[in-house]
Amino acid sequence: MTLSQTAVSRPQIFICTLLSSESLVDLYTQILEGDRYSLVHATYDNFLEIVEQGKHRIDCLIFEKNAALPKVVSHLHREAILLPAVLLQVEESVEKTSQPNSADRDPQQDSYYHIAEVIVDHDQEDILSSIDCAIAQFLQLSKACRLPTRLQKKYADEAIQDNLATQQQRLSQKLKERLGYLGVYYKRNPQQFFHKLTEEEQTDYLVTLKRDYRDIILNYFRQDSSVNQEIDDFVTQIFFADISILKILEIHMELMDAFAKKLKLEGRNEDILLDYRLTLIDIMAHLCEMYRRSIPKTR
């Protein structure tokens, strides 16, 4: 079983699974079907061969966290193969109930494969977001990826840390280049979303956002202005902060009200402000296009 060369040219996410249960194979085949994913199911006999041959094309691994995992991971470490990974928690044990999923896990807590892995219950329905999270965390790794604590000393003499760092950097760049604009979506950090900020941080953020929007309004109809770049920067900013369109509309209306009051005091007609609806439409169109081109298709 190998990865198709013709499929590589399509903007798909390549998934390689290592599952011992046929029911899990059938389940993930059904979930991951469609034009977004290209899927290959490996066995314990051919997994290492498939990964070694396809390490430049595979975007994410999905394997079970079971008794065979240490041997598999050990081989990947020796070969300096580092890929985004989702680990399925399938063992019915005290360990399962005592260990949180990676979304709630302390970043300093020891890992199995690498510190960007995502651990989920095997029956978790939202495997798609787990894959997205695994890729996102992998892309945000520093150049030096830390091995699990229990393995650092074992592989220190083999300079495996440097090899893994090189592999991570190369694979990260490959993902960004091959996924193109789609890669922008994966660089979003949910912890930096507006609704995750403290009240004080939100206040400061809105002050900056309103100032930037005011500059765009003032420059929008000026000749030889840098307003196009300002709009691009503004849209990128609200995209990565996950700011809602309603919030942008609110900022626009507040600014228009302020301008209207000023014009009224000056005895001038405020109808001119209607032209600035084009500014709002322009920004919303830019933002919608960015989401359209960047959000992965589920099917």
Curated annotation (Swiss-Prot):
Keyword Chloroplast recorded: no
Alphabetic keyword roster: Biological rhythms
Record domain KaiA C-terminal: where: 189-297
InterPro entries registered for this protein in UniProt: CheY-like_superfamily, Circadian_clock_KaiA, Circadian_clock_KaiA_N, Circadian_clock_protein_KaiA_C, KaiA/RbsU_helical_domain_sf
GO biological process: circadian rhythm
Domain KaiA N-terminal: 9-179
Assembly behavior: Homodimer. The KaiABC complex composition changes during the circadian cycle to control KaiC phosphorylation. Complexes KaiC(6), KaiA(2-4):KaiC(6), KaiB(6):KaiC(6) and KaiC(6):KaiB(6):KaiA(12) are among the most important forms, many form cooperatively. KaiA and CikA bind to the same region of the KaiB(fs) form and therefore compete.
Domain text: The N-terminal pseudoreceiver domain (PsR, approximately equal to KaiA N-terminal) binds oxidized quinones. The KaiA C-terminal domain mediates interaction with KaiC, homodimerization, and is responsible for the clock oscillation function.
Function: Key component of the KaiABC oscillator complex, which constitutes the main circadian regulator in cyanobacteria. Complex composition changes during the circadian cycle to control KaiC phosphorylation. KaiA stimulates KaiC autophosphorylation, while KaiB sequesters KaiA, leading to KaiC autodephosphorylation. KaiA binding to the KaiC CII domain during the subjective day yields KaiA(2-4):KaiC(6) complexes which stimulate KaiC autophosphorylation.
Protein name, entry field: Circadian clock oscillator protein KaiA
Taxonomic source organism: Acaryochloris marina (strain MBIC 11017)
Taxonomic lineage of the native organism: Bacteria, Bacillati, Cyanobacteriota, Cyanophyceae, Acaryochloridales
Gene that produces this protein: kaiA
